Design a protein with these regions (language model features):
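Conserved SAM/SAH-binding loop
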Residues: 102-108
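Class I SAM-dependent transferase core
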Residues: 1-52, 82-99
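A short acidic, Gly/Pro-enriched loop at the edge of an enzyme's catalytic core
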Residues: 108-115
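Conserved SAM-binding motif I beta-strand of class I
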Residues: 73-78
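Active-site capping/gating segments
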Residues: 154-190
């Protein structure tokens, strides 16, 4: 993780391709890296766990998670080629061998995974419809396979259809600071 934080990789790429909002690049660690690591705080993935990162953009949450869990396998997908190029180049520069970056829409992804992760890509009901086909029925972890999403704001209406099965954890449980007060991790077994 230290290599990611010390490296000018994202800053350099962001000056060429707007992967992270230019006004937010100074908050890279808190708003992107640390936020992504809320998933690692919530679940210690077992070795050989497979994870699909949907709408990864520049590699979040996939790249920080791949660093934290080197014995797990990650597939990062995004439909925008320039974003996948950045994620791929950052992963290569960091020497990450446990992830693959693909330019594709999640609808095109055929593989099965233990978990699907995402950061504020689309409304939860839409995401559930798209990724349900990608969840494996072989379990490796202490919890059932499913969807783990990082989101912010008022999620009441979005989570309402899943209120009986979803587990919602505020990110402020693990991280201090005003920015995390509205951020939540949503787990939905599928």
């Amino acid at each position: 993780m230290c290599a990611l934080l010390r490296s000018p990789l994202y800053r350099d790429w962001n000056s060429k391709i707007n992967v992270i909002s230019r006004k937010d690049i100074d908050n890279l660690y808190e708003h992107h890296v640390l936020h992504s690591l809320a998933i690692a705080k919530w679940i210690p993935f077992q070795p050989d766990t497979t994870i699909l990162d949907v709408g990864t953009g520049g590699g979040f949450p996939g790249i920080p998670l791949a660093i934290m869990f080197p014995q797990c396998q990650f597939v990062l997908v995004d439909s925008i080629g320039k974003k996948i190029k950045v994620a791929s180049e950052v992963a290569k520069a960091l020497g990450l061998t446990n992830l693959v970056c693909k330019q594709e829409r999640v609808e095109e992804e055929k593989e099965k995974f233990d978990f699907v992760v995402s950061r504020a890509v689309m409304p939860l009901p839409d995401l559930v419809k798209l990724v349900r086909k990608n969840i494996s029925n072989k379990h490796r972890n202490a919890i059932p396979n499913g969807l783990i999403v990082l989101k912010g704001g008022d999620l009441q209406a979005e989570v309402a259809p899943y209120i009986k099965t979803a587990e919602i954890t505020p990110c402020s449980k693990w991280f201090k600071g005003e920015w995390f007060e509205t951020k939540q991790l949503i787990y939905l077994p599928l």
